[in-house]
Amino acid sequence: MRDSVNDDPGGEQAKITPPKTWAAGVPAVAHALQYSLAETSPRRTALNLLDINQTKGFDCPGCAWPDPAPGRRHTNEYCENGAKHANDDATTRRVTPEFFRRYSVSELARSSDRWLNQQGRLTQPMVKRPGADHYEPISWRDAIALLADELRAMDSPDEAVFYTSGRAGNEPAFVLQLFARALGTNNLPDCSNMCHESSGAALHETLGIGKGDVSLLDIHHADLVLTVGQNPGSNHPRMLSALEETKRGGGQIVAVNPLPEAGLMRFKNPQKPRGVIGRGTNIADQFLQIRLGGDLALFQALNLLLLEAEDAAPGTVLDRAFIEHRTTGFEEFADHLRATVSWPDVLAATGLTRRQIEELRDRVLASERIVVCWAMGLTQQKHGVPTIRELVNFQLLRGNIGRPGAGVCPVRGHSNVQGDRTMGIWEKMPQDFLDALEREFSFTPPARHGLDTVDSIRAMLEGRVRVFLGLAGNFVRAAPDSERTEEAMRRCRLTAHISTKLNRSHAVCGDTALILPTLGRSERDCQGGEEQFITVEDSMSQVHASAGRLEPASSHLLSEVAILSRLARQTLGDRVPVPWEDFEADYGNIRDRIARVVPGFENFNTRVRKPGGFALPNPVNEGVFPTPGGKARFTRNDFTMLRAPEGHLLLQTLRSHDQWNTVPYTTDDRYRGIHGSRRIVLVHPADLAALGLADGAKVDVVSVWQDGTERRAEDFRLVSYPTTAGCAAAYYPETNVLVPLDSVADTSNTPTSKGIVVRLEPRP
């Protein structure tokens, strides 16, 4: 059995090469096929790749980037990581009861994420009994009865937590939230709590809706696109095709990021001749290598420069009509900026020069239509919410909200994470949603807000949570403060996970633990002899169908909808008049109910069967801002700066290129020039010199937090790398152990994985 260190050859054996300056191209195709063919047969690989993101196929279980309209899609409408992810799920490897007889839970808990994932698909329900160290088979009937009995035995419904990952489709998400609320709790944390919660909080406050307002065509037709705090070449590779269209249309791109990522520099589109035999397309016209946490200061400085440009040439810079008729708070915002922005502070916080920021201003002034895209580089900051509010201020100044070729675009990193929220997966859904549930299902949902991810962990640590149910995902590895999260899970009486593959959350578990194996996206889902489909919502609010055609990995698998419907029926009986059996028999019955509960889903079953599905209405694009005052809101945001004491650095956690969420497919990160290890810390050469450390040295990484607790990631290799001075980077989830549970973003409660104060301790 290999543990998490031995499964990784170790930093001293890693091969380091210069970082790549372009993304995709023929190597991306080769790597995708190499990985896919190692997981499954050529036939299954071909079937899967021909079905991904097609109108009659299945939605890629990877990121939430939207698909082109029907008729504009390629035959191969996927990226390298999407192909890996889909065929990883379609693997021919199987985790059978014999595997669990061979390996104890203790051994599995010492295993690496990569090794666990490589074992293959789960094949039948398994249970770990109290005091046991092995899983054993259990029938579906007994597994659901065991979980239902534990739920019924709780003193309060709030002793249960129902977690959802963005892999879950709309129909199972709707059933899960309905079950939780019928039981009597709003404890519905999800993966969004750890990523784009800051986006939703900021956009709700300023625009009245927690989603972006752009489409693919808006990006294609923009004069200027800002990509801020994101690495599209690895995390949303198909976004590069959209940015290529921006460049072809004459638009410019400015990238703002602490690392000079390959996908921000140049893109070789493998579906076009110039991407195969040519140089490809240059992406960023300007690259601003910003200091961690400096984005708020950057947008404040940029907004001040626009105000000053308007002062110098009144009526030529700001959209005065838009500001007057569609917004509120402008004067207070402008006065605040003029009184508080200090250029020495801005330059210290950003690590940029004034000339660089003025160059960006000049590009803005030359552009009529501007789109701003961002990801977790913003949302996982301590001040992520005010940063995004300031970004919205920037767009409001020139009327770049709610019109063609312009807008705000939070780029979400998991297939249906936005759809899950639309379906009600949130611990604090608005009252009008709860009222709609009550009208439709004749029970009164609880009004008191529930627990998000961080608060769920706190409650588990305090003994206030008895049962944890995870719908997809890998909660233990996705969450911050790994040691405390693991302790929290082990304090539960029962933990259960609806999963396709083995992961660490199955090994770090409660007294009793259930593994409930389910269908993958690419597999056929038949109920009563009738083929079913689920639906998903992408990052740009397009809702479409998803149906697989591969044979299920095991005859013992149940769909997510079937598992949840049976559990709800067994737990609740006739306490609420919900037809759970009908939901399992035909998912169209769920969609009929969604159509009557969720605005924008009217006539759901008919509309979603059209090729490409339908777009949800976005009031912002109609000039309507559903804020309390009916207008978009300028906000005042106080300057703040992340600081590290002398001898310390600011650390960000990030994915490698060869990784999807918590699953590393290999120990390589080839775009960054890292081969053969993930136990790596990227550090600027000037910082290495200042700290008296050598490139290649072995260190422990220790985070510094106000609670005085030592959080340590051991045995990492230093790699001299062109990151921003004063800032370092290391891979997630291995360094989640360094992120304190109580270090969260203001307002959103999102873990601050982009700005951890650390010191590097040389190893003997």
Q: Which ranges hold each PLM region?
A:
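Long, structured ligand/cofactor-binding scaffold of large enzymes
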Residues: 61, 135-224
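Short Cys/His-rich Zn2+-coordinating modules
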Residues: 37-47
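Long, low-complexity segments enriched in small/aliphatic residues
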Residues: 581-670
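Short, non-ligating residues that shape and space the ligands of small metal-coordination modules
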Residues: 69-70
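Short, flexible, mixed-charge glycine/proline-rich loop motifs
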Residues: 48-54
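Low-complexity, highly charged intrinsically disordered N-terminal segments
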Residues: 88-134, 144
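Short cysteine-rich clusters marking metal-coordination/redox-active sites
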Residues: 57-63
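Non-catalytic alpha/beta scaffold blocks inside enzyme catalytic domains
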Residues: 117, 126, 197-404, 410-593, ...
